[in-house]
Amino acid sequence: MVENKSLGMKIFRVVNTLLMLLMGAICFLPMWHVLMASISDPILLQQNHSLLLWPLGPATEKGYLLVSMNPNILSSYANTLFYVVVGTLLSAFGTLTIGYVLSRRSFRYRNVLMVMITITMLFKAGMVPLFLVVKSLKLLDTRWAVLLPSLLSVFNITIMRTAIEQLPESLMESAKIDGAGDVTILTRIVFPLVKTTFAVIVLFYAVSKWNEWFNAMLFLQNRKLFPLQLVLREILIINSDANAAGAEVAGGLDNYKELTKYATIIVATVPILCIYPFAQKYFVSGVMIGAVKG
């Protein structure tokens, strides 16, 4: 293959490289600023109003110590792991099975069901009706109140359905001729061929459930069931609600308000940042396979 060395191509590569570097900096610098701020001297940090490339003063872990002083942090971490693991498994399984059903042209009501599902994405009933439904099902103050309302995503179902629709119909027909049922076709033929898209959907659900706090705030009163994000939210606003985490922590956060704010952001973000590099390779191919109909 002959490499194109024309002036126009060279200019394009230079501009493209500069744009990529700029986009990388836009994504990287905010998190770097937060990390540096979380280990900076609290007094100097309160006086700073510029981007940080290194810590202000001697590096300190006081912000993280103040966050860890909250007795609910460990239990909230365990709760969040439960919500992420169980919720992601249920959501991914439901998305795969529903996507398979809606992709079958032999299923008479697939278009009707798809319209009904899509309507739920476009029109929301609202917070009060949702609360009343959860209450009528006696799910208030239970883990299911956090898991069930956000169990499935119409967007993810659409991606999975489209990915399965692109598979050759002859594969499923030949399997049926050999006596395979829908469960066998889904698990042994369809799933191995759409596992890249499935991996992306799993990551979408995991990130969404890791960051979930609103349903917990709306449906939970038992602090032992609170997810991490809700506890961290309380830490951030503890100056206006001193009873949220206890007087000892509140006093510390009064003196280290900015430092603790940045430390909580890092605590909530690092787990997802650690997982992303291992799943990044699935993103482009998985989403494109499920989003573009061939």
Label every PLM stretch briefly.
Residues 2-294:
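A hydrophobic, multi-pass inner-membrane permease signature
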